[in-house]
Amino acid sequence: MALKAWYWLKRKLVPVPHVRVPTAAFFTDVKATVYAEQLTLLDAAAFGCSDISELGMPFPEAEQSPDSVLFNHLSEWTVRTILAQSCPKRRARVVSHFIDIATLLHQMRNVHSEAAILSALSSAPIERLKDTWSRVTKSRRRSFRTLWELLCCPHETDTDCSTSKMEKVFSSKPFHLSVSFDHLRVRPSIQHLLEPCHFTELDPVGLGTFTFMVSTELEP
């Protein structure tokens, strides 16, 4: 069904975006720990070359920073990996695995990749897959809701609080840059899947429309 939907949409949207996703079997056979570790290594490299001055960059330029590119890619990759599966049962397995990865990322204090995955799981193309979500265990759905609530920003309209938090970010940056990940082993085959690939065929809005159309074809 997923392939049929893809070919149907290929006739509707030309050119169609390239999709580099693993099969459900390969994706879930690789432990969630491995994905969490590789994402952490990629994030460490991206943030290691960033500068505090980038926090004041205007939105269009900020979107091109290494950490933003990685965030957007991971979120899109999560959506595409789920939608590439042919039946609700397989999609549920993949969704469950992503929740496990997000849980481990939270434990590793890698909020960047954690937020990217959670935003993908709560995006319109994925959230609407009722049949898929009904096959995800209650414990995992509860874990997802808990993680998502932890990332909410209840004080985002409080200027004083926001300023205080920003100052803490500035002061803590040297400490985080000094953290070593030498104990983590790079796995090229996994990083190849996770590294950003630039889409020139469709803009982000077009890609979002594309994935939503795939979602509605899979589960009307």
Predicted regions and their residues:
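Eukaryotic small-GTPase/lipid signaling interfaces
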Residues: 1-220
